[in-house]
A protein has these predicted regions:
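A structural signal for short loop-to-beta-strand junctions that line the ligand-binding cleft
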Residues: 9-43, 60, 69-76, 163
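Ligand-binding pocket segment of bilobal, Venus flytrap-like solute-binding proteins
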Residues: 81-165
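Short loop->beta-strand "edge-of-pocket" segments that line small-molecule binding or catalytic clefts
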Residues: 60-80, 88-93
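Short, charged, surface-exposed loops that flank catalytic or proteolytic processing sites
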Residues: 53-58, 101
Length: 172
């Protein structure tokens, strides 16, 4: 709508030719993509190891007793990772199937999913890696690498991991 209303000025970055074609959203140079990343589930490796648990391999598992009260997600209305995860659940479960994304979210709610307004609060307050009580969090695929690179004390591997489930990882 904003493009149609003509509210943007044109600007062509000098290095636009280095941007992948999939991210060129406007060939009139009114809008330029500046950032992207994959959103998926992350897990606290130490917590799961101590509990003798393996990360879930399907979204359906998140509604089972093993994962009750163990997932924190971001609100889709206030957080882009939360919206990305919601969209991925629509892609995964569909909209009009016998069991669709609305059924999944109802089951997540019944399984004590915690919904926070933003990523920082979910990750740094409720994720077990930072003292919370939820070993699963919706985050970025780059979060484990960031945990490794920016660790206050040197580590030999990331303390968190990605849960890469087909159709449950979203490029934003």
């Amino acid at each position: 709508r904003a493009l149609d209303e003509g509210i943007f000025d044109t600007y062509k970055p000098d290095l636009l030719s280095k941007v992948s074609a999939q991210f060129i959203l406007d060939d009139t140079n009114h809008v330029t993509s500046i950032d992207y990343g994959y959103v998926n589930l992350n897990y606290d490796k130490s917590f799961l190891a101590a509990a003798g648990m393996a990360p879930p391999t399907t979204l359906e598992e998140l509604t089972g007793p093993d994962w009750k009260g163990k997932l924190v997600v971001e609100n889709a209305a206030t957080s882009s990772p939360g919206l990305a995860f919601l969209i991925s659940t629509v892609a995964y479960f569909g909209e009009d199937d016998d069991y669709d994304y609305l059924d999944f979210w109802a089951d997540l709610k019944a399984n004590d999913v915690l919904v926070k307004d933003g990523w920082s609060d979910a990750y740094y307050s409720d994720f077990t890696k930072y003292g919370g009580d939820r070993p699963l969090v919706v985050s970025y695929s780059t979060s484990p690498a960031a945990e490794f690179l920016f660790s206050e004390t040197p580590v030999t591997e990331p303390p968190t991991g990605n849960i890469l489930i087909d159709r449950a990882t979203f490029l934003q």
